[in-house]
């Protein structure tokens, strides 16, 4: 059992906490939360969620310094500088770094300077010791080497399992990805200044093209795809659940049925629970609360000229991603000596 603290109790921080509360036989103990908001507000937002609904069968209370969940006290602190946090005093082993601010190794090491032993960044990292996508390269995690780690992005977690299947089975020559992505907290509700002029526009009434490093980041977990993938994002007026549109040129000639069979076999075998496969005629809201990283929509798979393959897949960019953060934290806990 390792002692864990969450830094940043926003969408991913709270989703992670809910995932942990629902996980039986967890090897981690949630000990503390650092957030700029006060414990009572955070307790309220944990219990009542516009996407997930009310947290049922859980008793949540709060005071000035803590949140209590079913009798278990989670200490709360509020400091924007990680080096000031009481991680040494509270004997914290692992930080779930979900502020979106301290994503570089230099930034994450501030938690280590404060006494934590390891940091798991819930975003693409910079100069981190390793990036891991569960189901793709998690077996490469080395407890003695990887201290500042990244769980990549929600989109990379959706894309990488599909890329792995297609590359292993057919060989990827090159490809591109478009993610139709729900709006996030990094956009403006109404037109207002932003470093990205498109993200400056009202999120709930616009389709907002923007950049994403998700496709390039696949090479961090599947090195043979380095330089072969790129992509863009379209932020759309939905609050959650996104969709990847992945187009690749492959070495081995194939047909639609063969591509779908390869994806289905993976979903029932080595990638079970990570990659799902659906032939149902569903829409985005149907996938709210889905645990899998990626759900292939088989009816949308296309093959042109036997070598151009298009696969589309849904993902819950909050809940599904947070489940993988918890999975990676559990992996770290299992390797702890």
From Swiss-Prot:
The gene is gap2. Keywords: Calvin cycle, Cytoplasm, NADP, Nucleotide-binding, Oxidoreductase. Pathway: Carbohydrate biosynthesis; Calvin cycle. GO terms for biological process: glucose metabolic process; reductive pentose-phosphate cycle. Gap2 has a major role in carbon fixation as a component of the Calvin cycle. Catalyzes the oxidative phosphorylation of glyceraldehyde 3-phosphate (G3P) to 1,3-bisphosphoglycerate (BPG) using the cofactor NAD. The first reaction step involves the formation of a hemiacetal intermediate between G3P and a cysteine residue, and this hemiacetal intermediate is then oxidized to a thioester, with concomitant reduction of NAD to NADH. The reduced NADH is then exchanged with the second NAD, and the thioester is attacked by a nucleophilic inorganic phosphate to produce BPG. Homotetramer. NCBIfam families: GAPDH-I, PRK07403.1. GO terms for molecular function: glyceraldehyde-3-phosphate dehydrogenase (NAD+) (phosphorylating) activity; glyceraldehyde-3-phosphate dehydrogenase (NADP+) (phosphorylating) activity; NAD binding; NADP binding. D-glyceraldehyde 3-phosphate binds at residues 153-155, 184, 199, 212-213, 235. This is Glyceraldehyde-3-phosphate dehydrogenase 2. InterPro entries: GlycerAld/Erythrose_P_DH, GlycerAld_3-P_DH_AS, GlycerAld_3-P_DH_cat, GlycerAld_3-P_DH_NAD(P)-bd, Glyceraldehyde-3-P_DH_1, NAD(P)-bd_dom_sf. The active site is at 154 (nucleophile). Belongs to the glyceraldehyde-3-phosphate dehydrogenase family. It comes from Trichormus variabilis (strain ATCC 29413 / PCC 7937). The record marks 181 as: Activates thiol group during catalysis.
């Amino acid at each position: 059992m390792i002692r864990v603290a969450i830094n940043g109790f926003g969408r991913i921080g709270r989703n992670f906490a809910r995932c942990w509360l629902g996980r039986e036989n967890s090897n981690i103990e949630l000990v503390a939360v650092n957030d700029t908001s006060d414990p009572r507000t955070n307790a309220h937002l944990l219990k009542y969620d516009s996407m997930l609904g009310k947290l049922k069968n859980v008793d949540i209370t709060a005071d000035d310094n803590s949140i209590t969940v079913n009798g278990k006290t989670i200490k709360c602190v509020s400091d924007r500088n990680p080096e000031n946090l009481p991680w040494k005093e509270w004997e914290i082993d692992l930080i779930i770094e979900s502020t979106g601010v301290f994503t570089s190794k230099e930034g994450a090491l501030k938690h280590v300077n404060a006494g934590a032993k390891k940091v798991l960044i819930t975003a693409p990292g910079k100069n981190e010791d390793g990036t891991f996508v569960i189901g793709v390269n998690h077996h490469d995690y080395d407890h003695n080497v990887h201290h500042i780690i990244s769980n990549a992005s929600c989109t990379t977690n959706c894309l990488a399992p599909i890329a792995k299947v297609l590359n292993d089975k057919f060989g990827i020559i090159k490809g591109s990805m478009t993610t139709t992505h729900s709006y996030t907290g990094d956009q403006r509700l109404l037109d207002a200044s932003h470093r990205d002029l498109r993200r400056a526009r009202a999120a709930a009434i616009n389709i907002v093209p923007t950049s994403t490093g998700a496709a390039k980041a696949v090479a961090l977990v599947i090195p043979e795809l380095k330089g072969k993938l790129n992509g863009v994002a379209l932020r759309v007026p939905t609050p959650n659940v996104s969709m990847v549109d992945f187009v690749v040129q492959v070495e081995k000639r194939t047909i639609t049925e063969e591509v779908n069979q390869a994806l289905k076999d993976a979903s029932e075998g080595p990638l079970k629970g990570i990659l799902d496969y659906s032939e149902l005629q569903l829409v985005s809201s149907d996938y709210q609360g889905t645990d899998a990283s990626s759900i292939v929509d088989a009816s949308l798979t296309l093959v042109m000229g036997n070598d151009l393959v298009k696969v589309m897949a849904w993902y819950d960019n909050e809940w599904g991603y947070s489940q993988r953060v918890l999975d990676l934290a559990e992996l770290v806990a299992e390797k702890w000596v």
